[in-house]
Every structure is written in C-alpha cells, then in structure tokens.
C-alpha cells in the first residue's frame, strides 16, 4: 500500500480579503503560516515521513510546504516545483472581491465560474498587466501554455500529465510523497483518483492547511482517503470554502 499526502496551502492574504487569486503570487497570512505548521505537527504526530515533496511555483504553496517540512525536520528533502500544480487561473476575475463579484453577477453565475467543470471565467487580455505571460518563472513555456483563464477541466488537463509523468512513477517506486498545492489543482487530482463525475466535482471543497491522505493500492487506485486531525474541523473548514463569494 502507498500513501499520498495532499495539502492545500494555508490561508493567503487574498483568501483573507475574499479575492479571486488564481496565478497571482500572493503570500500567506500569519494564520496561513500557523496552518502550515500545524499540518507538519499533525503529520509528525502520526508518524509520517517522506522521500520527496512536490509543490507549485507560487509562494503560498511553496511557503506552506517549507513550514510543514520544518515541523517535520525535513527541510532538506528534494522538492519538485511545477507550474502544472498552480492554482486554476481565474482570468479577468483575478484580484476581484468574491462577494462584490457575486453582487454584480449573481451568486449562481459566480458559483458556475468558481466550481463548475467546464465554464471558465472571462479571460484576461494578453496585454493585461495581471497576465503572467511576461513572468520569468514561465519563460520556458509557450504563450499558449500560460493561460488567460481556465475552468476546472483545463486545470485537470494541465495537472494530469504531471501526475502521470512524475508523481505516479515516483509513488510506484516506493517513494513517499507530500504535495503542497492549491484548492483546484488538488480538486483535479482528487477528481481523477476517485473518478468523481463532472457534475459531482462542483460540490467538492478543499480546506486550507489540513493534510488529506490517500491510501493507494499497487495500481494507485484509492483504498480510502481521510483528513488528519479533527474530522469535524476539516468539514467545517471545507464548508467555509464553499461559502466564499457570498455577500
């Protein structure tokens, strides 16, 4: 049996401000730092250890990973950074307040943009200063690989090649993985692992900073999954994610 640990980054400054973040590179709040440390403490208390860590190229995920590994005394672990683990790109919504956007367009439309499988938000213009196409961290990518907007379907299509080419082979060789990523890149992985339908994925919310453990068989099919720590607290935190965007 293999174990895979997925952690959504701790609270970011734009989580706190209830803003659409996407690929915007915002930092953790003090609460987010504590959530990341608590994730490490939970993992340490349960006896978890790792051989390699994976994260995105966005600082809220990389800092979450660092604080988690620091609590585990594993800051020396090899870390694989990939843009494919970035948060879903929210297009022209990036930087906007979720509640104000809901008041303008309606709760239903914002829910579709936030949680539906195949409907992306309005795209950024290519020359919009919020676009990441001139960001040095994406310099080796083609312009088409740096999105101007994404739906979850697009995020799945971006994440799965990385799972198939890097993460899954590492697990099959017996390496123990911890992944610090984002709500939607984790939703993409969970959708694939659990075979969740396009319709059902709308209701899945990933809480900040709580380790999600997958136990996998030799074919990397899930045997079970669970959050570490207080299950009721994890459920409450997921519900809080679901309520974002409401006035």
UniProtKB/Swiss-Prot annotation:
Cross-referenced Pfam families: His_Phos_1
Annotated pathway: Carbohydrate degradation; glycolysis; pyruvate from D-glyceraldehyde 3-phosphate: step 3/5
Binding-site residues for substrate, renumbered to this chain: 8-15, 21-22, 60, 87-90, 98, 114-115, 183-184
An individual GO BP term: glycolytic process
SMART domains recorded: PGAM (SM00855)
Site (Transition state stabilizer): 182
Keywords: Gluconeogenesis, Glycolysis, Isomerase
The keyword Kinase is assigned to this record: no
Keyword Isomerase (UniProt): yes
Catalytic reaction annotation: (2R)-2-phosphoglycerate = (2R)-3-phosphoglycerate
Superkingdom field: Bacteria
Assembly with partners or alone: Homodimer.
Protein name: 2,3-bisphosphoglycerate-dependent phosphoglycerate mutase
Organism for this UniProt entry: Variovorax paradoxus (strain S110)
């Amino acid at each position: 049996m293999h174990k895979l640990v997925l952690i959504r980054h701790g609270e970011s400054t734009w989580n706190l401000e209830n803003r659409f973040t996407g690929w915007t590179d915002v930092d953790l709040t003090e609460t987010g730092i504590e959530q990341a440390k608590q994730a490490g403490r939970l993992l340490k208390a349960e006896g978890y250890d790792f051989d390699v860590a994976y994260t995105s190229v966005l600082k809220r995920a990389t800092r979450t990973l660092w604080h988690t590994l620091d609590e585990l005394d594993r800051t020396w672990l090899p870390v694989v950074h990939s843009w494919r683990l970035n948060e879903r790109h929210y297009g022209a919504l990036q930087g906007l307040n979720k509640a104000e956007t809901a008041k303008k367009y309606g709760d239903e439309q914002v829910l579709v943009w936030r949680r539906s499988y195949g409907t992306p938000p309005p795209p950024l213009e290519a020359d919009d200063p919020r676009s990441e196409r001139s960001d040095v961290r994406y310099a080796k990518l083609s312009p088409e690989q740096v999105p101007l907007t994404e739906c979850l379907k697009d995020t799945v299509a971006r994440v799965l090649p990385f799972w198939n080419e890097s993460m899954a082979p590492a697990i099959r060789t017996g390496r123990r993985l911890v992944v610090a990523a984002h709500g939607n890149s984790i939703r993409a992985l969970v959708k694939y692992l659990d075979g969740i339908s396009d319709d059902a994925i709308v209701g899945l919310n990933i809480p900040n900073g709580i380790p999600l453990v997958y136990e996998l068989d030799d074919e990397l099919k899930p045997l079970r999954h669970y959050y570490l720590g207080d299950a009721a607290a994890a459920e409450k935190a997921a519900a809080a994610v679901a309520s974002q965007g409401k006035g």
